[in-house]
């Protein structure tokens, strides 16, 4: 697939788990695992967007591309937009915001999301999976998404709402939101 870029926003100063990108998983930093997942999708250029020189140097030392961004961004999508707006020579058709804490994601789902975006002319897309157990259902660190229809076998639905905590039992149309977003370039400009 051409004309797609995957941008991974990553920073050391996270509130819930400081230095998370540098945490070791099997003797390798989490951000390197995430970068490898993105590369293994084989859909386009991969760039890590970070305000931290330590992350930049780690990515570059491992033959990846990283750029320094402003350290004042409120969200990862703001960081992604800075790279899109100021650091790319040509503007890709699809921008994938792949969260820097997803080292176990199957690279094929990134490819599936990009293919769906192109085939269905979507402006914005994201992924969801089944909520596996009661603990995940109650965990405020697990973002849930409520959709307008049952999603099975790579089907797609419209997101109705996103939330972390619910005071009532979850609807059967509530799923575990996966932290990856795809935008057309026009949608990213409108969103940010």
Kindly label every feature range from the protein language model.
Residues 27, 69-71, 100, 147, ...:
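Active-site donor-binding loop signature of nucleotide-sugar glycosyltransferases
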Residues 23, 56, 189:
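Nucleotide phosphate-binding site architecture
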Residues 2-50:
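N-terminal glycine-rich phosphate-binding loop and ensuing alpha1 helix
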Residues 43, 90-92, 119-123:
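Short, high-confidence coil segments that cap the C-terminus of an alpha-helix
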């Amino acid at each position: 697939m051409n004309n797609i870029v995957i941008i991974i926003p990553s920073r050391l100063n996270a509130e819930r788990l400081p230095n998370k990108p540098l945490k070791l998983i099997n003797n390798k930093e989490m951000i390197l695992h995430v970068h490898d997942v993105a590369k293994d999708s084989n859909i386009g250029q991969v760039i890590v967007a970070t305000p931290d020189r330590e992350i930049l140097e780690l990515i570059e030392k491992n033959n990846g591309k990283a750029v320094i961004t402003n350290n004042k961004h409120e969200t990862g999508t703001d960081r992604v937009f800075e790279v899109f707006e100021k650091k790319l020579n040509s503007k890709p058709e699809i921008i994938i915001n792949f969260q820097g804490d997803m080292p176990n994601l199957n690279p094929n789902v990134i490819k599936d999301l990009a293919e769906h975006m192109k085939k269905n002319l979507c402006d914005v897309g994201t992924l969801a999976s089944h909520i596996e157990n009661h603990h995940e259902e109650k965990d405020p660190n697990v973002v849930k998404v409520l959709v307008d229809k049952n999603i099975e076998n790579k089907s797609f639905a419209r997101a109705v709402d996103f939330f972390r905590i619910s005071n009532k039992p979850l609807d059967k149309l509530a799923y575990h939101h996966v932290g990856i977003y795809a935008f057309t370039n026009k949608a990213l400009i409108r969103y940010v």
